[in-house]
A protein has these predicted regions:
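Claisen-condensing/thiolase-fold acyl-transfer catalytic domains that form or cleave C-C bonds
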Residues: 1-117
Length: 117
C-alpha cells in the first residue's frame, strides 16, 4: 500500500501519484494489472487520473463492473468496496494482479496492489 499527499485544490488527482508510488515500490507495471479499481469521486476526476496514467478512457480492465458512479460510493467503506470488487473480478477472470486506488479528502491518495493466490 502507498499513500501520498497533493495540494488540496487537486485532491482528486492523488490516485495518480499513489499508483506510481506503489508500482515503483513493488517493481510491477500498470500493464501487469489485470483489474484496476479506481474510485470515481466524480467523472472528470477519474478521467484525469486515467489520462495521467496513460490509460485509455475506455480501458476494459478499469472498473469492469462499473465504478462508484454506477454502483455506489459507500462513504466510510469505499476502500472495502474497491478491494472486494477487485478480488471478485480477479477470481472471475483468473487474473493475477489488481490495483485499487482512490482519492481521500483534503489531498490524500491511496493505492494498493492485490495478488491472487
Amino acid at each position: 500500500t502507498a499513500t501520498v499527499g497533493v495540494a488540496p485544490r487537486i485532491m482528486g488527482y492523488a490516485p495518480a501519484p499513489a499508483t506510481r508510488k506503489i508500482l515503483a515500490r513493488t517493481g510491477l507495471s500498470l500493464s501487469q494489472m489485470n483489474v484496476i479499481e479506481l474510485n470515481e469521486a466524480f467523472a472528470a476526476q477519474a478521467l484525469a487520473v486515467m489520462r495521467d496514467l496513460e490509460l485509455a478512457d475506455d480501458a476494459a480492465n478499469v472498473n469492469p463492473n462499473g465504478g462508484a458512479i454506477a454502483i455506489g460510493h459507500p462513504l466510510g467503506a469505499s476502500g472495502a468496496r474497491l478491494v472486494t470488487t477487485a478480488v471478485s473480478q480477479l477470481h472471475l477472470t483468473q487474473g493475477r494482479y489488481a490495483l485499487c486506488t482512490m482519492c481521500i479528502g483534503v489531498g490524500q491518495g491511496i493505492a494498493t496492489i492485490l495478488e491472487r493466490c
